[in-house]
Every structure is written in structure tokens, then in C-alpha cells.
Amino acid sequence: MKVINISFLCGLLFQSMLFGQKLTDVDGKSYSIATIKGYQWMTTNLAVKRFKNGEKIMQAQSQEEWKYAAANRIAAWCYYADETGVDMTTILYNWYAVSDKRGLAPSGTHIPSFGEWSALAKNLGGIEVAGGILKSKTGWETSQHLIADPANTFNAKPVGSRYIYLDASANWLDGKSKGKYTNFWTRSSINNDTNSEHAHRMGLAYDVDYLIDDLDGSAESILNAKGNGFSVRCVVDVLP
């Protein structure tokens, strides 16, 4: 009797999805993917509003709700907002959504660790230049710190962030970071301590080339508080 290798067949099925250069989340939203130094990365930010099991993620619609989610370690997302209004194309997550066991990343992908982000930066030529390479060609306040990437595959846009402690976020409509900054969560807590209130993030800024990466593995800062609202990119799982 012929034995069918289920793992092999599943691998082929997954690879066929991969070759189509698209991934789909539980809400039906599709994401393009691109190979960057041997790894498959999403080329746009995650924008899902439900976990993989179908349960809704809490949407915070005020600073009070955002702070409540952080204080109680509740997974939450919000739209970016500033004095010009609400940007409903930009979804920001707190770290508790990133780490929730119900699963934020689309099937077949995962949220990268601090180590995976560091490896990406190294493969792009180092922390000093990786930030400029990862930026989108448009949207930033200045093009002085963009480094030529003909493929422009990562395409990180300056969509802004939401900080739980900074004065700039004390007013829900006072973001002041769109066009200047963007941050991406890693799945790694500071010191690998899940009880810590801080986690590693990777940041890009309009006025520097380097990738802001919290190189000090024990750094705890208001800038990497788990209650902050940052963007998320996912990496395609490597098949065995």
C-alpha cells in the first residue's frame, strides 16, 4: 500500500500559496510577500482585527480605553489619529495582541523575534544602514535618509505610533509622529521575561539611516512599553 506523506503534501500546498506571493488573514485581507535575504516578509503592515480563532481583538477608541488595555494586559488595537483626524488605513497593536496565544499572525506566518529582526538588519549591511533601506520611497518628511533599494521590497511607511506614557499621546488626537516615525513590534520581551512591561521594537525615523533596535538587551524605556501601539510585520514560517 502506498503511504502518503501528509506533511509533504501540506508543505506543497503551503508552498503553492507562497509562490502566489499572497497571504490571507482571518478577515480575508490579502498581503503581498517578498523574499528579503532568504526570508519571506510581508510587504505591508498587518491589519487584522480578529485572532486566528475568529475572536475579535478589542478596539480602543479613546485614550482611556487604550490605557485600560495596557494596565490590564489586554490585547488591543487602535487606528492612528492626530490633529488631522483618524487614519483608518493604519492599525496599531499593543504587545499583548502580538503575544496572545489565540494568534495574531496569519496562518503560515509568525511575528518575528528580536533575533530575526537583527538578522535582517545584518543581512542588509548592518544596523547603520538598514533603516534607510527598509523605508518606503515616499511619505517620509525628508528623502535625505533613504538608501537606494531598487526592489523597494519592505516598503516601511511612516505611519506613526501610539505611546502609552509620552505627552504626545495624552490627547487621543495628538499623535504627531506620522510622516516622521514608525515602529514594529517583535515578539520578544526584554530579557525574555514575559512578565516585563517592556518588549523589543524596531524603529525607523525620518532623520536617520540606522535601524532603532534597542541594542541593549535589558533596555527598559517608555519607548518600548508593551502598552504602546506599533505596527506589525510577519515572516513566513520556514518549512522543515
Regions found by a protein language model. Name each.
Residues 21-240:
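Conserved positions within compact, well-structured domain cores
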